Amino acid sequence: MSRVKRGVTAHARHKKVLARAKGFRGQRKSNYRIAHQAVMKALTYEYRDRRTKKRDFRSLWIVRINAAARSEGVTYSRFMNGLLRAGIQLDRKVLADIAVRDKAAFSRLVEVVKGQLAA
């Protein structure tokens, strides 16, 4: 049976890992064994944080909507309930953007909501 020399594949694999570790500090970028551990840890953080990002942004949108709604004299929960009753189907991302960028439009939305809540 012939002998298999794996220097080329090992070098390619090491090169790939070290390329992913580019920008890391200290031996984490230049020592293969340490870089491999750092890259594996980075990948787990990456996977976890893609999911966390969705929760974080939803929380941010809710905080922004609540702040804008309270400045108009209505709480977040009553505002969202009023939107539901009025049949206005805007998601939290769009509502937060309107609250930040277009105060007049958000005020008109609040007026519609107050009308629904009073009825």
From Swiss-Prot:
Organism: Acidithiobacillus ferrooxidans (strain ATCC 23270 / DSM 14882 / CIP 104768 / NCIMB 8455)
Family the UniProt entry places it in: Belongs to the bacterial ribosomal protein bL20 family.
Gene Ontology molecular function: any one: rRNA binding
InterPro entries documented for this protein: Ribosomal_bL20, RIBOSOMAL_L20_CS, Ribosomal_protein_bL20_C
Stated name of the protein: Large ribosomal subunit protein bL20
GO cellular component terms attached to this protein's record: ribonucleoprotein complex; ribosome
Keywords: Ribonucleoprotein, Ribosomal protein, RNA-binding, rRNA-binding
Cited function: Binds directly to 23S ribosomal RNA and is necessary for the in vitro assembly process of the 50S ribosomal subunit. It is not involved in the protein synthesizing functions of that subunit.
SUPFAM superfamilies in alphabetical order: Ribosomal protein L20 (SSF74731)
CDD domains: Ribosomal_L20
